[in-house]
Amino acid sequence: MRPVYITRTSSFMPNDPVQNSEIEEYLGMIGGKPSRAKELILRNNQIKTRYYALDKSQNVTHSAFDMAVESIRSLYGDRINENTIDLLAAGTASQEMIMPSHGVQIHGQMGGERDMEVVSFAGSCCSGIHALKYCQMAVSSGERSRAVAVASERFSAWMRASFFNDEYESLSRLMEDPMIAFEKDFLRFMLSDGASAVLVTDKPNENGLSLKLEWVELTSYANTMPTCMYAGAQYEG
């Protein structure tokens, strides 16, 4: 097995940082009223600023694959570009189309002359790490030598007020029942947008830092634990 290194990292955040006081200017107010749970949620999550791929009229400014491509392009330089990468592994929990897959959308927007292996991963929280593990295994096996793992999310489009019914969980119930922490209002003040990418290679940098990647371990507990985050269905446990 060959050694594996992360030799470059990058990120892309859309637009300007959004202050907590501005959140509902971007997402809108459900029923035209400020959220009663907002301050409680923000006090507990301690998020101070975030980024949205939206303007204050709730118009989308970037797609998830736009942001992914920008983060990948930030890896370029010193013979690294869309024509020298031989594997693209992409992860997201907020894919914008059923088909084609997230990774293929990104590859199409990258352009270039290089045909390459592309894989896509989906799922809450860990899809980007799945992409990283795939790159690690491909480089370790000797099948690939320059791989990019990228993750991007655009949850703000899901969180716009226009997509929510005019219904609120009471503040007292939010404080009494921790499972309400996964309901609608909670997610509006937790999730935001952005992308990050890493270059995974079989050789360390000649100059600069490299991170040797020895293992990535992933374990699902879905067989014993209840679902905590879901989309696209009514979940009845």
Predicted regions located by residue number:
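Condensing-enzyme catalytic core mediating Claisen C-C bond formation in acyl metabolism
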Residues: 1-61, 174-237
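Short beta-strand segments
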Residues: 7-8, 91, 122, 147-153, ...
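Conserved catalytic cysteine-centered active-site region
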Residues: 38, 42-52, 60-65, 93-146
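Short glycine-rich or small-residue beta-strand-to-loop segments that form or flank ligand, phosphate
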Residues: 86-94
